[in-house]
């Protein structure tokens, strides 16, 4: 793929998501989703490997099915109510179909099976776009229509996502699959709190995207996709290893890192609404996520072989070039917890 083609695809991604975010008409919103879907497929096949082509086909079939269901629900709602406005969903059947379609686009359980498979077959940068930028449009739609959606369905999808995302990530050795199940669990947190405090979903999504982009950038810089090479990284790139450890702990929600803030605020909001059972379940699922993050950290630190390095300088491969934005991303993803009172005020 030529650089010009890549630039066009990235611009189409930006255009499609922007169209969805700024639309109040179901047809324009659906067009934005389709532009984003069609634009990312060439990026998924960037390496021209059979696995990447397979993942692109899986992604296309899943997203096409979800788009078909979403358009059917919007058309049914228009037929029943006579308008295409995004905020006015008066039909229960349309509301239910829209919820399932958006859950399929987000990768919420039980529609999550495509996420780890597609991510495993794609490159690190394509996977980063899938888990960050491609979540903006579906989350924004749920954010806008959440008052009209069925709360019981949303709660079921959210809790099952946090449980399955944490449980299935326990036995993974591929870093991309670990990040996929982490994304499923985080999406469950966001969809759950959107029922009670939608603004908190925006904060949660922002911090999640920040940490995920930083982590994928480190993986791409060090060219690591499995947990086994992490045991050799400490001698080659100690700064990168430290960055991976801090970012994983932040994603796991361990204080005093940035990722603790959204989990703290979500559980606090659930307790305010006298939903102690839900808060307890979320806290337990957060421990599941933290456990498989700790397994990766264990592989990168405590399984290091005793090696003697007689050189003054650490060895780096030719592909190891530190992006200028990486230090900023790592710092923001790990040190923003003291700003939590400001987050609460803004919310």
UniProtKB/Swiss-Prot annotation:
One of its GO terms (molecular function) is NADH dehydrogenase (ubiquinone) activity. It catalyses: a ubiquinone + NADH + 5 H(+)(in) = a ubiquinol + NAD(+) + 4 H(+)(out). InterPro entries: Complex_I_Subunit_2 (IPR050175), NADH_DH_su2_C (IPR010933), NADH_UbQ_OxRdtase_chain2 (IPR003917), ND/Mrp_TM (IPR001750). It is an enzyme of class 7 (translocase). Its main location: mitochondrion. Core subunit of respiratory chain NADH dehydrogenase (Complex I) which is composed of 45 different subunits. Interacts with TMEM242. Belongs to the complex I subunit 2 family. This is NADH-ubiquinone oxidoreductase chain 2. It comes from Ornithorhynchus anatinus. The lineage of its organism: Eukaryota, Metazoa, Chordata, Craniata, Vertebrata.
């Amino acid at each position: 793929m030529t650089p010009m083609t890549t630039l066009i695809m990235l611009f189409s991604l930006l255009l499609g998501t922007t169209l969805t975010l700024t639309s109040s008409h179901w047809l324009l919103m659906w067009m934005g989703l389709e532009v984003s879907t069609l634009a990312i497929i060439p990026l998924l096949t960037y390496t021209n490997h059979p696995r990447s082509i397979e993942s692109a086909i899986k992604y296309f079939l899943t997203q096409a099915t979800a788009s078909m269901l979403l358009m059917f629900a919007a058309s049914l709602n228009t037929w029943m109510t006579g308008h295409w406005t995004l905020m006015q969903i008066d039909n229960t059947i349309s509301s239910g179909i829209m919820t399932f379609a958006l859950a399929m686009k987000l990768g919420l359980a039980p529609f999550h099976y495509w996420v780890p498979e597609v991510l495993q077959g794609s490159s690190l940068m394509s996977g980063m776009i899938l888990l960050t930028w491609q979540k903006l449009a579906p989350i924004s739609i749920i954010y806008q229509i959440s008052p009209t959606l069925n709360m019981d369905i949303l709660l079921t999808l959210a809790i099952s996502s946090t449980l399955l995302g944490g449980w299935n990530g326990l036995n993974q050795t591929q870093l991309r699959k670990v990040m996929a199940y982490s994304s499923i669990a985080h999406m469950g947190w966001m969809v759950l709190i959107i029922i009670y405090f939608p603004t908190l979903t925006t904060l949660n999504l922002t911090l999640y995207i920040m940490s995920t982009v930083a982590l994928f950038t480190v993986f791409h810089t060090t060219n690591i996709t499995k947990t086994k090479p992490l045991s050799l990284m400490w001698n080659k790139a100690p700064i990168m290893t430290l960055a991976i450890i801090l970012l994983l702990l932040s994603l796991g929600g361990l204080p005093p890192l940035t990722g603790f803030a959204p989990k703290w605020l979500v559980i606090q909001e659930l307790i305010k609404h006298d939903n102690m059972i839900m808060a307890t379940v979320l806290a337990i699922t957060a421990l599941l996520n933290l456990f498989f993050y700790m397994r990766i950290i264990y592989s990168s630190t405590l399984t290091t072989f005793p090696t003697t390095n007689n050189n003054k300088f650490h060895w780096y491969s030719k592909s190891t070039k530190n992006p200028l934005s990486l230090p900023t991303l790592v710092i923001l993803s790990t040190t923003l917890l003291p700003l939590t009172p400001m987050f609460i005020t803004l919310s």
